[in-house]
């Protein structure tokens, strides 16, 4: 049995999922990402309306999770989200004449990576969980085909077919910024976690080894590392950042190595 790892946590491969074995597209996707059919698996992958979706089988009323860079909330933010004035843009050092090359080391569903790409950054996404990586790949496929955003998406946004920053460091050209948004356990007192996040956390779990991400991120980035954290979370790995950019519910801890030029 193969395994993929980032820091200490190891995800054993292949990953069990439920899917229609008579659907060639699904069979191909699952084979590519080492996902194997299991009649008792808690999650199902479906391919409907040219879109790969993930479903939690014991909560059939929940909508499927998919990656969509073309419509919905991400499209609205791209058009009306504040451009380079956004906190995330300031955190990665976007400014006039400076458009950094970014590695998103915890890509998830790709939303922050998409924001940065839409603002001009070249973004390489790293996602260690194969199911999430499959969703990302499908979202990119549809975005690349879109008449409005396809051209610049193909130029600026890609998925690294590997599971760790260490693996990426062996292949990647110079990286200006590494961006990290580790999954953080929600407070029991917090408002109901969004349905999507609940499904996502059940699949992936909290990044209990997140502290181990900082060192390889610092080794890979030439300019800075940016860590997105809930406002109540401690510093990653207990290391004090060079500066902090605060938002309503989160903050961006910035670890500066050299000036952005």
UniProtKB/Swiss-Prot annotation:
Mention any Pfam family matching this sequence: SAM_MT
Query: What GO CC annotations are associated with the protein?
Result: cytoplasm
- Kindly give the InterPro entries that the UniProt entry links to this protein: 16SrRNA_methylTrfase_J, SAM-dependent_MTases_sf
Its EC number is 2.1.1.242
Q: Where in the cell is it found?
A: Cytoplasm
Q: Which GO terms describe its molecular function?
A: rRNA (guanine-N2-)-methyltransferase activity
The yes or no answer to whether the keyword Transferase is present is: yes
Name the domain of life this protein comes from: Bacteria
What span is annotated as the signal peptide, if there is one? none
Residues annotated to bind S-adenosyl-L-methionine? 111-112, 127-128, 163-164, 181
Main localization, broad class: cytoplasm
Q: Does the keyword Cell cycle apply?
A: no
Sequence similarity? Belongs to the methyltransferase superfamily. RsmJ family.
Protein name, please? Ribosomal RNA small subunit methyltransferase J
The record lists the organism as: Shewanella sp. (strain MR-4)
Whichever gene encodes this chain, its name is: rsmJ
């Amino acid at each position: 049995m193969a395994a993929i790892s980032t820091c200490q946590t190891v995800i054993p491969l292949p990953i069990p999922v439920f899917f229609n074995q008579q659907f060639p597209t699904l069979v191909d996707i699952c084979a590519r990402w080492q996902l194997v059919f299991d009649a008792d698996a808690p999650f199902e992958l479906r391919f409907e309306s040219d879109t790969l979706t993930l479903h939690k089988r014991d909560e059939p009323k929940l909508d499927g999770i998919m990656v969509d860079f073309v419509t919905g909330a991400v499209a609205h933010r791209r058009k009306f989200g504040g451009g380079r004035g956004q906190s995330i843009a300031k955190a990665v050092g976007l400014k006039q004449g400076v458009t950094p090359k970014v590695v998103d080391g915890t890509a998830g569903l790709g939303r922050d990576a998409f924001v940065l790409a839409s603002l001009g950054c070249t973004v390489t996404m790293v996602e260690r969980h194969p199911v999430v990586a499959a969703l990302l790949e499908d979202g990119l496929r549809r975005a690349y085909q879109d008449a409005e955003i396809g051209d610049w998406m193909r130029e600026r946004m890609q998925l690294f077919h590997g599971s760790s920053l260490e693996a990426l460091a062996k292949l990647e050209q110079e990286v200006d910024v590494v961006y990290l948004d580790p999954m953080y356990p929600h407070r029991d007192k917090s408002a109901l976690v969004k349905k999507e996040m609940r499904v996502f956390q059940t699949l992936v779990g909290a990044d209990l080894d997140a502290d181990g991400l900082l060192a390889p991120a610092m080794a890979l980035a030439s300019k800075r590392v940016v860590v997105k954290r809930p406002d109540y979370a401690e510093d990653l790995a207990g290391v004090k950042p060079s500066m902090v950019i605060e938002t309503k519910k989160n903050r961006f801890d910035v670890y500066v190595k050299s000036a952005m030029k």
